């Protein structure tokens, strides 16, 4: 396996929302997230649990664009990669809030079966390592 890229997750609220520094600041609020198997949603749930707070309803949404639109309209909050927000041309209706590193810093890995490290997988690995300029985490005999 190798790290494909690192992401920064941020909490987003409507632009009028006060600063968020801990889970209690948004306790009981509606959150928009992907299904419960989403690792980003799990980070959000861990942040609440470890902060001793409880979110309100968690509404499942199937796209970042819909999630951001709901947040911009003041319907709730969401967690999203900062790179997704960088693609949005008008961010004036949302506000971003940093998360502590253990919740906000994530790595996405390219993994492959030990018996299936094909030339195509190697080419993908090399392309990702070159594009994101990160050293390989392990050799081609990975998991």
Task: State where each predicted segment sits.
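Secondary-structure junction motif
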Residues: 30-51, 118-122, 135-139
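A late-sequence structural motif
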Residues: 21, 95-138
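Short beta-strand-centered segments that line the small-molecule binding cleft or hinge
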Residues: 1-9, 13, 22, 72, ...
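Hydrophobic hinge/microswitch elements
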Residues: 37-95
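Short beta-strand/turn micro-motifs composed of small residues
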Residues: 13, 33-35, 61, 112-114
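Short secondary-structure boundary segments
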Residues: 15, 81-84, 108, 114
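Well-formed, non-transmembrane alpha-helical positions, independent of function
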Residues: 3, 24-25, 47, 69
């Amino acid at each position: 396996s190798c790290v494909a890229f690192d992401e920064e997750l941020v909490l987003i609220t409507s632009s009028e929302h006060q600063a968020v520094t801990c889970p209690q600041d948004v306790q009981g609020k509606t959150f928009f997230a992907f299904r419960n198997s989403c690792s980003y949603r799990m980070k959000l749930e861990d942040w609440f649990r470890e902060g001793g707070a409880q979110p309100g309803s968690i509404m499942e949404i199937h796209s970042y664009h819909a999630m951001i639109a709901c947040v911009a309209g003041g319907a709730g909050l969401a967690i999203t990669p900062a790179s997704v927000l960088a693609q949005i041309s008008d961010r004036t209706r949302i506000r971003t809030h940093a998360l502590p590193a253990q919740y906000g810093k994530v790595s996405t890995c390219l993994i492959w079966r030990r018996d299936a490290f094909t030339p195509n997988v190697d080419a993908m690995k090399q392309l990702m390592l070159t594009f994101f300029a990160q050293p390989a985490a392990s050799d081609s005999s990975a998991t």
